[in-house]
């Protein structure tokens, strides 16, 4: 089984990183082959909404996403770890997610209507932390995660969301 962990924070060793490291330790202990991505260290342009992927299922932007797409498609389980920045995900992580419109388009082009919403490819999970105690802190992130995993034909099977965590290592 392949497990992919996506570090959404630009702060290495921060609270969301610590959550993801623990999740990956558990996956490795269960025999999974784990790999990770750090979008903030990669060349990932935002989606241009050019519509090319709507016709072909392939994004025409040439950057690090071309190497990321196969990793996303091969993983059985994906963990997305993210801090909350103004009630949302950091921009580098969000750019990666937005660029998965190509994978959603690919699925819609290549699968029959009855197979388009089977979510039979695997499971996705979100690990999120934020400093504020706001009641709606994670609502937007849950929606983004749900539709990110939908684009990958994966079910969104759960989350760990921790608020009132501000300083590095406070979790």
Regions found by a protein language model. Give the residues of each.
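Residue-level recognition of beta-strand->loop/alpha-helix junctions
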Residues: 7, 38, 160-161
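Glycine-rich phosphate/pyrophosphate-binding loop and the adjoining helix
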Residues: 1, 29-30, 135-171
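Short, glycine/serine-rich, charged loops/turns that create anion-binding
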Residues: 10-11, 41, 131-132
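N-terminal beta-loop-helix "entrance" segment that forms/cooperates
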Residues: 39-58, 166-171
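A structural signal for isolated positions on well-ordered beta-strands in alpha/beta enzyme cores
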Residues: 2-4, 35, 125, 157-158
């Amino acid at each position: 089984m392949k497990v992919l962990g996506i570090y959404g924070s630009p702060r290495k060793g921060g609270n969301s990183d610590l959550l993801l490291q623990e999740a990956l330790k558990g996956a490795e202990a269960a025999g999974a082959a784990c790999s990770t991505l750090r979008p903030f260290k990669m060349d990932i342009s935002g989606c241009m909404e050019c519509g090319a992927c709507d016709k072909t299922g392939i994004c025409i932007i040439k950057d690090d996403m071309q190497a990321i797409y196969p990793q996303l498609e091969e993983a059985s389980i994906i963990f997305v770890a993210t801090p909350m920045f103004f009630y949302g995900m950091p921009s580098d992580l969000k750019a990666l997610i937005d660029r998965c419109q190509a994978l959603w388009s690919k699925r819609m082009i290549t699968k029959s209507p009855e197979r388009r919403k089977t979510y039979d490819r695997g499971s996705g999970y979100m690990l999120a932390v934020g400093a504020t105690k706001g009641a709606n802190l994670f609502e937007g992130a849950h929606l983004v995660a749900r539709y990110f995993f939908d684009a990958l034909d994966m079910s969104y099977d759960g989350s760990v969301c921790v608020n009132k965590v501000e300083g590095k290592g406070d979790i």
